[in-house]
């Protein structure tokens, strides 16, 4: 078991070597334990309101992937662009929050996440509506099953983010900016320079309901930036070349799980919803969270529903 002091030392050394720029630290092998005071406080925090709303995404086709003639930031993993049909489903309107995940942790009697005790404290009230982070794909999958949901497929995630028309960002084709998304926050400044490990363990993320002006055509929040999000698929850079035209679910096997959306640490190209990447299922990062999806029985209502 590695202790917090060792991790903090590694972080500080890394930051000095990188000249004050924040890079992510995988904390998959870090184990924390509840203090009696911390668990008591968590039992109170878990009573606070949570964002549990889901959004219906209607059955139908959407434009998946990118066309470099239109999007000059497109990566190889986004080609070719084409129409794909996806059955109706529901997806969380917001990223899973710390208080939602706390309910799961307490119900399963699991250890707290590393950032829940940052800066010598315990689960802070200011964290309640922040997206959960430092969760592996296995953690995210377990939570969704516990909540009687599932992780969205990569195609479902992309459709919920972009709508039907292949727009570059959830709000349209206008470039990403800090008025619409939380991204590009990699510099150390002010008091943070004296406590760089605090920034890595609890970075500059924002509440999941911020940026109402940047929701997707279906009203889904923060599909660009804040934290990137795990999906159910295995990741293969070349998958779009052979993916089926109906309900693609990713490769049958792999070594990495796909994540989407980019996080606070990423640059503009990486917060485009078409961008795909992957990481090992056990990876836990301070820019990586998730949201859940749910199957629905198709109906005339879901067939006829349209994005805004």
Positions of the model-derived regions?
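N-terminal Sec-pathway targeting helices
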Residues: 1-10
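Short, P/G- and charge-enriched loop/turn segments at secondary-structure junctions
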Residues: 42-44, 70-80, 194-195, 276-281
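Functional-site microenvironments in short loops/helix caps that host divalent-cation chemistry
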Residues: 63, 67-68, 117-275, 307
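A short glycine-rich, aromatic-capped structural motif
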Residues: 46-115, 135-138, 225
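Short, structured beta-strand segments at or near domain termini in extracellular proteins/domains
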Residues: 286-300
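N-terminal pre-domain segments of enzymes
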Residues: 25-47
């Amino acid at each position: 078991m590695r202790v917090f002091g060792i991790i903090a030392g590694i972080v500080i050394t890394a930051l000095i070597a990188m000249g004050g720029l924040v890079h992510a630290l995988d904390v998959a092998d870090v184990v924390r334990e509840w203090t009696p005071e911390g668990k008591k406080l968590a039992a109170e925090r878990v009573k606070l309101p949570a964002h549990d709303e889901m959004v219906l995404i209607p059955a139908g086709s959407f434009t998946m992937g990118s066309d470099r003639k239109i999007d000059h930031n497109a990566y190889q993993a986004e080609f070719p662009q084409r129409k794909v049909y996806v059955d109706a489903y529901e997806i969380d309107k917001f990223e899973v929050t710390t208080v939602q995940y706390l309910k799961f942790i307490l119900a399963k009697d699991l250890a707290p996440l590393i950032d829940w005790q940052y800066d010598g404290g315990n689960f802070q009230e200011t964290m309640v509506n922040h997206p959960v982070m430092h969760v592996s794909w296995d953690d995210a999958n377990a939570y969704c099953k516990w909540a009687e949901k599932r992780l969205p497929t990569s195609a479902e995630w992309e459709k919920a983010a972009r709508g039907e028309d292949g727009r570059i960002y959830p709000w349209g084709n206008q470039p990403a900016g800090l008025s619409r998304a939380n991204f590009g926050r990699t510099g150390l400044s002010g008091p943070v320079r004296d406590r760089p490990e605090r920034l890595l363990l609890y970075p500059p993320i924002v509440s999941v309901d911020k940026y109402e002006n940047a929701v997707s055509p279906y009203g889904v929040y923060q599909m660009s930036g804040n934290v990137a999000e795990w999906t159910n698929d295995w990741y293969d850079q070349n998958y779009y070349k052979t993916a089926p035209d109906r309900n693609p679910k990713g490769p049958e096997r792999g070594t990495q799980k796909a994540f989407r959306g980019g996080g606070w640490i990423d640059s503009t190209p990486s917060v485009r919803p078409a961008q795909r990447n992957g990481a090992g299922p056990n990876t836990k990062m301070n820019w990586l969270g998730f949201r859940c999806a749910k199957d629905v029985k198709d109906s005339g209502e879901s067939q006829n529903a349209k994005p805004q």
